[in-house]
Amino acid sequence: MSTDRRQLLTLVAGALAAPSLARAQSPGMSRVTAFAFSFAGLEGGDIRLSEYAGKPILVVNTASLCGYTPQYAGLQQLWTRYHDRGLMIVGVPSNDFGAQEPGTPIDIMKTAHDDYGVTFPLAAKAEVKGRNAHPFYKWAAVERPVETPRWNFHKYLIGRDGHIAAVFPTEIEPMDARVIDAVVKELDRVE
């Protein structure tokens, strides 16, 4: 085989291997997982994601005065249906988009608990974008840089391995078949 042909084959083999190398070194394959983070709880205490290691976790930035606030009801339905199988949901109230979460913890609890019957854990109000974002959201922005929250009710599904398994933008309702399919896939996954 000629030197030119050998160099060409080496170049082609390298080009074919590059995508798999890129996947192996992609941000989603970082050593840090979601289980490294915790949120202050809206009603006190901490919500430690490490306590749910090995289970899927849906982390959703929420707001009480948003056109999407009725998604609380869908999140509660999802929680009711799959919590006993291991699904964890964490709502993270945020005032980052349209100043639609200006209230106090009592105001937030009234909206979530009284108006929508929410029983899944809610974090204390936190920033989800920018340099003051909660560490979980900074990590998620590295894991999935083009799928960061652009509005309220952005959903990150954390897989059993602690990495982001799926991302659902605001417009996708919690009971949408795509969300349910992704949740069930993670629940059925054997580690």
Language-model features, listed with the residues they occupy:
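Short active-site neighborhood of thiol/selenol oxidoreductases, capturing the structured segment around
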Residues: E51-G67, I89-V90
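N-terminal secretory signal peptides and thylakoid transit peptides that target proteins
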Residues: M1-A15
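N-terminal "domain-start" segment that seeds a small globular fold
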Residues: Q25-S50
